[in-house]
Regions:
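Small-polar-interrupted transmembrane alpha-helices in polytopic inner-membrane proteins
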Residues: 2-22, 34-38
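Structural helix-adjacent loops and short alpha-helical linkers that scaffold large soluble proteins
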Residues: 2-3, 51, 55
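Structural motif marking the loop-to-transmembrane transition
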Residues: 3-7, 23-32, 59, 63-66
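Transmembrane beta-barrel domains of bacterial outer-membrane proteins
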Residues: 13, 80-333
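Alpha-helical transmembrane segments that form the membrane-embedded catalytic/substrate-binding core
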Residues: 20-49
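Short, amphipathic alpha-helical segments
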Residues: 34-37, 41, 60, 64, ...
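Flexible, glycine-rich linker and terminal segments associated
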Residues: 53-89, 102
Length: 333
């Protein structure tokens, strides 16, 4: 079960910290790899099960098996030894899975220098596992519903990446209004960003709600809000190295994610999202640190399976002493 596997993930993190590295064991690494291992491990387990159970042959089957090997090597190894009978121990049903691939050009600007861009290519995926607004009996176990976004930035001088994930631990469906649908529950969050001007990580658990309201015609309005505590997070700091030997500040805190999305006919959509993370510094240059970003994007369908979009991002960094305050902009197609 999910809860029965958590101690093994934490134990694996401890073993690596104490016996697999040359440096002294670090509490922040134990917490980060423990939380991250639980989240990423369960997501990989669920996704690989959906892939190998899919009915396809030829090149499609080869592609499914290759991706399943990438996201969950242990399942492939067990199938080689024990055969497909190990599949009977996987989750008994496969919920709907929506997978998107992204690619384009991303640019970042400094504050007060908006005309100076650093364009570079990026690729990414967006994954939604399960239906948050489906039948009442669909959500029986942790991670029966989760969302994952991963991005990779091809900057030659400073390549970057980001991961934003949240998975349902426990939830209940609600039905506000005449046709509204909602999911409220407890979610686990694993967020990480490392780009040209912005670096942070946060792991936590908290409450959240996701809603969907059909409008007239084919329009639909969606909203989500998550508030969660951060067990341990970190944010980059130019002034921490002289104090701690690290270029980031560490500490517990809190986080918030919000998004408002409106879908229109013909595959068009508009979205506005804002996330903010606050950290109380246990090790670093400032007593309190904050990191947040605002995103506005629009998309339009080109074909049934392809969309073209434009996104504007604003990154802001705050500290109580003002040492690490920063503001940057991003634009991507």
């Amino acid at each position: 079960s999910f809860w029965g596997s958590v101690p093994f993930t934490v134990f694996g993190s401890l073993v690596w910290e104490f016996f697999g590295e040359r440096e002294n064991a670090s509490l922040n690494d134990v917490i980060t790899t423990g939380f991250g291992g639980v989240a990423m491990g369960e997501m990989g387990h669920r996704l690989s099960a959906a892939l190998v159970r899919g009915r396809s042959d030829g090149a499609g089957r080869v592609a499914r098996e290759a991706v399943a090997l990438l996201v969950n090597p242990v399942l492939t190894f067990n199938r080689l030894i024990y055969g497909d009978r190990v599949l009977y121990r996987l989750p008994g049903r496969t919920p709907p899975v929506d997978l998107e691939f992204h690619s384009g050009i991303n640019g970042t600007w400094e504050r007060r220098a908006f005309t100076i861009a650093f364009p570079h290519p990026f690729i990414g995926i967006g994954l939604r596992y399960g239906d948050p607004f489906g039948a009442a009996g669909d959500l029986r176990a942790p991670y029966d519903y989760f969302r994952l976004r991963v991005g990779l930035y091809g900057d030659v001088d400073n390549p970057g990446s980001d991961v934003f994930a949240h998975g349902l631990l426990w939830g209940r469906r609600l039905y506000p209004g005449r046709e509204g649908r909602a999911l409220a529950g407890v979610f686990q969050h694993f967020d990480y960003m490392d780009n040209y001007k912005f670096k942070f990580a946060a792991n936590g658990v908290g409450g959240g709600i996701e809603t969907s309201f059909p409008l007239d015609g084919e329009r639909e309005l969606g909203f989500l809000l998550h508030l969660f505590g951060v067990a341990l997070g970190g944010v980059d700091s130019r002034y921490s190295r002289g104090l701690t030997g690290r270029d980031y500040s560490l500490g517990p805190g809190a986080g918030m994610k919000s998004e408002l999305r409106c879908s229109f006919p013909a595959g068009r959509s508009l979205a506005l999202a804002y996330s903010y993370y606050w950290f109380f510094t246990l090790s670093g240059s400032d007593r309190e640190n904050g990191a947040g970003f605002l995103s506005g994007q629009g998309e339009a369908a080109v074909t049934d399976t392809t969309r073209l979009g434009l996104e504007f991002r604003l990154y802001h960094r705050w500290s109580d002493a003002g040492f690490d305050d920063a503001l940057s902009f991003g634009l991507r197609t």
